């Protein structure tokens, strides 16, 4: 069977949480979802529910029943929740983490839509003037005698029309691919001391810190020791995040306190201080959850700020292009007048 799609995993998790909170046994909850979902949900999803039920007939473990049907990381989290007896809250936490991650991704993509549209509009306007407007002046005055500002605009527009825009898109795609690769794999002092202070690496760091706090909160709430929690979070993660987690584990093995052990440049100083103060208290998992919520709110604010900055930059770029076009036209008209 294929992995259940994110859409249906969220549906499944939501219904399971509601039914389990109403004290309906797990198998009965799955049976109810299957029976009521026929004709509403996708056939493959219903088959997946049936497979989960069949697996649970021979093994009551939900973890084993879901293995291969959901991502390994979610399997690990459900296993922890199941072993702790807090399966409902564990599934709810997994669902929330997925929704939060999707929301952040959606806002990040949305923040780039306006600049992208503005860039395309700018290229179309420049190409349009070069192809439709400026050629009418060629019969009156050779291009070689046009003002420099007009020649530059004319040549750029024709280059865009003849395929430069494709090269621009390819360059942007390659650049983004390189950035994604670097954000997942580059580690060390150069990453910690320099790259992580710049976009998009600082956003990657903030997202990772938020997810780390949310996951550790759930694991601690399920009575998983902190060191074991780090191993679970480290499962199938990026090379960059794994390097932080490995350093945390090494620091804890040396007997350092939380503030020192977790100081790998992933978490900010305020987070580290809060964790150090509350680490020995029974409600430490609640404190971690609060930190995760605060980090998530701050991340949304940063993305909103970035979106505003990018929008302003794109508007300025478009405005400068329009000024360039009118300047080129007026310069050309003035040149023509003086040549007559």
From Swiss-Prot:
Cross-referenced InterPro entries: GspF/PilC, T2SS_GspF/T4SS_PilC_CS, T2SS_GspF_dom, T2SS_GspF_sf
Q: Which Gene3D superfamilies match?
A: Type II secretion system (T2SS), domain F (1.20.81.30)
One cellular component (GO) term of this entry: plasma membrane
Biological process GO terms, please?
Answer: protein secretion by the type II secretion system
Coiled-coil spans are: none
Q: Where are the transmembrane segments?
A: 108-131, 146-161, 312-333
Q: What is its main location?
A: membrane
Q: Where is it located?
A: Cell inner membrane
Sorted keywords for this record are:
Cell inner membrane, Cell membrane, Membrane, Protein transport, Transmembrane, Transmembrane helix, Transport
Give the way it sits in the membrane.
Answer: Multi-pass membrane protein
Query: Function of this protein?
Result: Probably involved in cholera toxin receptor (GM1) interaction in order to bring the cells within close proximity of the ganglioside for efficient toxin delivery.
PANTHER family xref list: GENERAL SECRETION PATHWAY PROTEIN (PTHR30012), PROTEIN TRANSPORT PROTEIN HOFC HOMOLOG (PTHR30012:SF7)
Q: Which family does it belong to?
A: Belongs to the GSP F family.
> What protein name does the entry list?
Toxin coregulated pilus biosynthesis protein E
What organism does the UniProt record list as the source? Vibrio cholerae serotype O1 (strain ATCC 39315 / El Tor Inaba N16961)
């Amino acid at each position: 069977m294929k992995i259940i799609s994110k859409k249906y995993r969220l549906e499944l998790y939501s219904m399971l949480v509601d039914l389990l909170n109403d004290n309906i046994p797990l198998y009965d909850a799955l049976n109810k979802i299957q029976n009521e979902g026929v004709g509403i949900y996708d056939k493959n999803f219903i088959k997946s529910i049936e497979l989960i039920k069949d697996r649970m007939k021979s093994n009551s473990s939900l973890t084993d029943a879901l293995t291969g049907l959901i991502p390994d990381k979610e399997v690990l989290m459900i296993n922890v929740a199941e072993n702790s007896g807090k399966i409902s809250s564990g599934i709810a936490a997994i669902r929330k983490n997925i929704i939060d991650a999707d929301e952040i991704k959606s806002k990040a993509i949305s923040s780039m839509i306006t600049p992208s549209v503005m860039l395309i509009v700018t290229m179309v306007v420049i190409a349009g003037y070069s192809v439709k407007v400026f050629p009418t002046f060629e019969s009156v005055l050779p291009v070689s005698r046009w003002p420099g500002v007009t020649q530059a605009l004319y040549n750029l527009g024709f280059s865009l029309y003849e395929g430069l825009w494709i090269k621009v898109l390819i360059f942007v795609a390659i650049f983004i691919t390189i950035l994604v690769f670097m954000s997942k794999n580059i580690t060390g002092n150069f990453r910690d001391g320099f790259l992580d202070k710049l976009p998009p690496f600082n956003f990657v760091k903030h997202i990772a810190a938020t997810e780390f706090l949310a996951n550790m909160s759930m694991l601690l709430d399920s009575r998983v020791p902190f060191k074991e929690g780090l191993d679970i979070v480290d499962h199938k993660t990026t090379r960059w995040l794994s390097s932080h987690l490995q350093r945390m584990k090494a620091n804890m093995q040396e007997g350092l306190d939380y503030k020192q052990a977790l100081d790998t440049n992933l978490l900010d100083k305020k987070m580290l201080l809060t964790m150090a103060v509350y680490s020995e208290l029974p409600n430490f998992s609640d404190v971690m959850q609060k930190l995760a919520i605060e980090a998530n709110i701050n991340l949304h604010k940063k993305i909103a700020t970035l979106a505003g900055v990018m929008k302003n930059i794109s508007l300025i770029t478009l405005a400068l292009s329009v000024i360039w076009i009118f300047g080129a036209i007026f310069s050309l008209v003035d040149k023509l007048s003086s040549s007559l």
